[in-house]
Amino acid sequence: MEYKSTLNMTKSGFPMRAGLPKREPEMLKHWEELDLYNELLKKNEGKPLFNLHDGPPFSNGALHMGHALNKSIKDFITRSYAMRGYYTPYIPGWDNHGMPIESAIIKQNKLNHKAMSVAEFRSACHEFADHYIDVQRDGFKRMGVVGDWEHPYKTMDPGFEAQEVRVFGKMYQNGHIYKGLKPVYWCAHDETALAGAEIEYKDDPCTTVYVKFPMNDDLGKLSHLDRSKLFFVIWTTTIWTLPGNLAIALHPDESYAVVKAPNGEMYIMAEALIEKVMGIGGFDSYEVVEIHPGCFYENMLASHPFLPKTSRLVLADYVTMDSGTGCVHTAPGFGADDYETCKRYGMEMVVPVDDQGRHTDYAGKYAGMLTDESNSIILEDMKKDGTLFASEEIVHSYPHCWRCKNPIIFRATPQWFCSVDSFKDEAIAACNDVRWVPAWGKDRMRSMILERTDWCISRQRRWGLPIPVFYCKDCGKPICTPESIEAVATLFEKEGSNAWFDMAAEDILPKGFTCPHCGASAGFEKETDTLDGWFDSGSTHFAAMERDQGFWPSTMYMEGLDQYRGWFQSSLLVAVGALGRGAPFKECLTHGWTVDGEGKAMHKSLGNGMDPAEIFEKYGADLLRLWAGSSDYHVDVRCSDEIFKQLSQNYLKFRNTCKFCLDNLVNFDPNDLVKPEEMLPLDKWAVTRLNDLITKVFAWYDNYEFHSVSHAINDFCVVELSSFYFDILKDRLYCDEADGPERRSAQTALFLILDAMTRMFAPILAFTCDEVWLAMPHRAEDDGRNVLFNEMVQPYTQYALSQEEMENWGRIASLRSAVNGALEQARADKIIGKSLEAAVSLTVPQEDAFLTRMSEEALADLFIVSQVSLTVGDEVSVRVKAAAGVKCGRCWKVLHSVASVGEHEALCPRCAAVMAKLPKME
């Protein structure tokens, strides 16, 4: 007789094959119809606030894996807090101004931007930025990121621009903004100043030179020496800066020697570096004539090696003895330290390079040459005229523009600066009130602020927020008053910042406005520079978050490691310097870079990149989310097709676990769970293991350790459930009475496991967990519309086993491994086929004597054999033989109790009882 139809092998309709690329868009449509984001806010309104303020990506290209990692982690955070009872508004944002947008449209559209009017060019930039906002928004939505996508903030929106103008005004009135001539990073290709956060360092080959500066005036201190043969020797890696040399810096307390070479020339250099420098110069022998401290040479004059001018000997504590000659080439137009040193000595500022990176007339015969072009020519000229002491080829780390990738120069130009020194202590103190994840972020931020120089906030670009400063034509002084700032802000709110370029200064300023410096009532000009994009993004907490949401500070900022010198820092400086507040975030979390499978940076040119859009189509967004959720993102995160293939296997284990639960919960009513005292010990073991997982998952979500959540749930599915619990449970689920107490005990445990696991994994596997949620039965208090509307469950302590009982179950699991090993050997020896054909004789030591309290039938179920005999002895021993008896035609156990019952042949008592309650089979 065929008994298969009498087994409880129900099917839920939940498919084993995920088909995520096709299924996920359907889920997204369902979420949109549900108005998921707003419904979630309504549900949690009035609860504690968790506000993750979105760091705005540039709207200048399609999604890349860095975007995918970043937005996935943010979504994990907001979803996990929402499911733990928090109100979680999430307003995405975009950074729109600046060189990345300008460069992209010029390159893509081959625009002659210099021939375009400001209005035309800014319109093209605006259109370009809007397009990529749409592209990126569609990608983020496809990933399942929940947020207010219809109302994002944009740094180019009029309301934002107006608030940023007010931020600038506050910082100006606080005395932290000034205009000055100082060396800044300068990109000659793009003709603009750059911030430190816009610099990338690359290893470049370079020619370093040791140059002889003849003694000109020794102040009578070295008159006993032949001045015509006396030289200071300097060292530099930037030959093109030599025309700008005004001084030679020595350390006041270091010893400097006059070293005589065999050729009769005498060279002044640091005593500590004589052997190295003379060796580079090709001198095997030399004589140290005399030694003096660096301060001995102060205010002496040397002649420039190829220009008709002198260089003063000055003192500086920053001079080190680890490289060069100890005599430091000092050009105030090209270096911050150089500038400060020469300023201290009252020397003039000389900048012999123009905006395009060409030498000016000040450089003499090199005028008109690009700096790169002049290097080799100056070198050859010095070789010819004998001023070159030596040269070397080296590879050094040199700054490049982050956008055009060309080498940059350090060049003094008139710029607007934020004086960080004036509020540096307050900014550093503000770091103490932030939770940094990882914890070392605090020291990193504090040290960066401590070491930073003034912030250059002006840019010589057209696509940016105009610096809201006017100039009086009569007295020439800059004007930035509360009245002028509010006039500009009000104008921008109504018409946007393009109005600055379209209107005359008098039409922007209030009627009757007069110069606060000289009282002039007419003749004003507008500043032509725009603000640094980091000032834009650094103002988002005030110009977007506080303005639109009314929240300040945010609960969290979360971005990549590079933002310590970028968005984190600019936001902190704006908050302290402009608003007089502390940090604009309570927590600061960082992630690493995305790299390829070998740990290399991904670049189009290398062909090792991965496209999120292609991953959506091949694997589905949930696999992308699982990649982010399975990776320790505090370090660099690897991605490759092989990694995604492995993740697919992990995903299937979770999905199959859910399917097993769902299939066995058909017709189960979770409103009628068995009472704790009715649950069987094995089921309590499973729930207790679940409780342990729940406790750990809560802690991991608190610490943003999403990879721990993912790995633990995967291990729970594979080790505790599939390999142990489900394996043992199948007989009870399939063969017991459908509504019997033993099967309902198992179903109760399965429901608790599926319910808790689906909620716990929902922040990461958003699509799949919601698919499971829609397929599973629910309790009356559950919101069946979406898993996100339900909080994560607390441990089910009422069903938990004691610690002693759990230790006993640990011993059972160990014994089961021993039994399985013996069964495998018996199968290999042809003693048995399937494990139900086996009878096991098990000997256990005294510590396992608790097993004698269990029936041999229960032990047989645990080991998935037909018969077990148990004895207590000295050590574990397992013997396997073929079970004696008759095979039950329904459950396939081999038992002595199998017999014919009425019309049913060869049934065990359990199966016979079940059959007796079923309708009579035809």
PLM regions and their residue ranges:
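Residue patterns forming the tRNA-binding/recognition surfaces of aminoacyl-tRNA synthetases
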Residues: 2-20, 26, 30-34, 106-243, ...
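N-terminal catalytic cores of NTP/NDP-binding nucleotidyl/phosphoryl-transfer enzymes
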Residues: 42-103, 164, 234-242, 314-345, ...
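Acidic, turn-prone loop/beta-hairpin segments
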Residues: 95, 184, 188, 194-202, ...
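Residues immediately within or flanking Cys/His clusters that coordinate Zn2+
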Residues: 184, 398, 467-469, 512, ...
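Short cysteine-rich clusters marking metal-coordination/redox-active sites
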Residues: 187, 401, 472, 515-518, ...
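Cys/His-coordinated zinc-binding microdomains
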Residues: 191, 460, 476, 519, ...
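Protease-associated
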Residues: 247, 254-327, 336
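Alpha-helical recognition segments enriched in aromatics with Gly/Pro capping
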Residues: 312, 345-357, 461-463, 482-636
